[in-house]
Design a protein with these regions (language model features):
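Intrinsically disordered, low-complexity segments enriched in serine, threonine, and glycine
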Residues: 69-212
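Intrinsically disordered, low-complexity boundary segments flanking structured domains
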Residues: 8, 18-21, 40-42, 97-103, ...
Length: 212
């Protein structure tokens, strides 16, 4: 029933409403987000046709799969099966590797960075290839989460402390660069003036494509 299907479409595609569109082939699975501008159907033709116009402030198609690179001085090593003897066993392993590596198979794009842990001071993320950096001035308390978004059109720096989220973009040190991921392998390293060993850093990335 064409009329029934048309009304089902209207229930999903509503002008001025948010919409998320998925596109998939055997090689790629992506999505885009936007606001429905119009949904126009030709109701009185033998072959029903229509056109949906969607305004997308973010111009990219994003992979449905997320990649995460992590830094922590302590790497988890806990196992739920306990040893049968009384010998000591590790619940964590101390890491001397400050490098985070992530591969970008899409176009150059920004990413999300989460810094937590603490106490620490003046956390800094460096691009290992260019020495460009982002530094947040000030203290990180135990339980804090700093979230940095470097995506075009959506650059933010926020602090979540005791359940309250505040804008701290003013704590971004002068000379900092809004870091991005180039195509291919990207390496970043972590520094802090105090408390580096207590920091946990997560770099969250989805491959992004201008066309699919």
């Amino acid at each position: 029933d064409v009329e029934k299907r048309r009304h089902e479409l209207y229930q999903v595609v509503k002008p001025s409403r948010y919409i998320k569109i998925y596109y998939s082939t055997k090689n790629i699975s992506v999505y885009a987000e936007g606001i429905v501008e119009t949904c126009e159907m030709e109701n009185f033709e033998m072959l029903t046709k229509g056109q949906i116009s969607i305004l997308c402030p973010d111009i990219y198609w994003y992979s449905t799969e997320t990649q995460i690179a992590e830094y922590s001085k302590i790497r988890g090593a806990f196992h739920f099966i306990f040893p049968d003897n009384d010998e000591p066993f590790p619940i964590g392993q101390y890491s001397t590797q400050n490098i985070m590596t992530i591969v970008n198979d899409g176009d150059e794009v920004g990413f999300i960075l989460e810094i937590s842990g603490g106490p620490a001071k003046n956390p800094t993320i460096y691009n290992a290839a260019t020495d460009e950096y982002m530094q947040i001035l000030g203290d990180i308390k135990d339980g804090d989460v700093i979230t940095i978004t470097t995506k075009t059109g959506n650059k933010t720096v926020t602090l979540e402390r005791e359940g309250v989220v505040t804008n701290i973009i003013n704590r971004l040190v002068s000379g900092s660069t809004w870091l991005t991921l180039k195509q291919g392998e990207n390496k970043f390293y972590v520094r802090a003036s105090e408390g580096l060993s207590s920091l946990k850093v997560r770099l969250i990335h989805r491959n992004a494509y201008l066309g699919v």
